[in-house]
Amino acid sequence: MKIIIAPAKIMKIDRDSFPVQSKPEFLDKTRILEEFLKSRSEDQLIELWHASKKVTEQSIEQLKNMNLDKRLTPAILAFSGIQYQYMAPDLFTQPALDYIQKNLRILSGFYGMLRPFDGVCPYRLELNTKMKGFIDYSLYHFWNDQIAESLFKEDDTVINLASKQYMRLVKPYLNENRKMITIDFQELKNDQWKTVGVHAKMARGEMVRFIAENQMKNPAELRDFHDFEFQYSPEASSLDHYVFRTHFDFKRH
């Protein structure tokens, strides 16, 4: 089985912890996006990114220094959002690192899809960006079915730990031979079970580590996940939707 996760907006450079092992599968398409971004004026980039002045200035500097072939960081270390902090890949055993290189995939608006040890550089390009002036009106259209085709080349089951924005790279291309199981983390709020974004990101990171450390091959094994006191809920789940619920007090964590 393959596991998909979303990238993070915050990126960092780390060339010391682990070596780069591979190149991104869709690097030729990434070069097209790089060329487009570098052809935009500062005002056009501001409109494209919809970011604060500080973030825009940082992103423009990143773009000026961008080199897709040199001084790269392994993708699993390049993203530093909540999910990646709780995943803590720098603490993985070697078997767990080998497992994620084979089975974990990071979806990306800029790179399409990444293996953990593909070499990347910092970028700013959300998947839902309106691509004014580009050859395609949206990145969903630009990437089309390529991500799904690659994902299901070796496996018929994908574990979805990505956000709704990124799972749209895969979901439209499912069929009777392609199965995707979405993982949902819920907690009780005002007598209703709800997904709290920050806590879900924490749990997704912990679950990736749980899967990797235990070298899981069968989706049913995921039901044994109990971090943050989450319990698999059979009554709320279905064949393609695993729901985990908790009464854990995140405020005290």
From Swiss-Prot:
One of its GO terms (cellular component) is cytosol. Coiled coil: none annotated. It comes from the Bacteria. This is UPF0246 protein lhv_1883. The lineage of its organism: Bacteria, Bacillati, Bacillota, Bacilli, Lactobacillales. Belongs to the UPF0246 family. Pfam families: H2O2_YaaD. InterPro entries: YaaA.
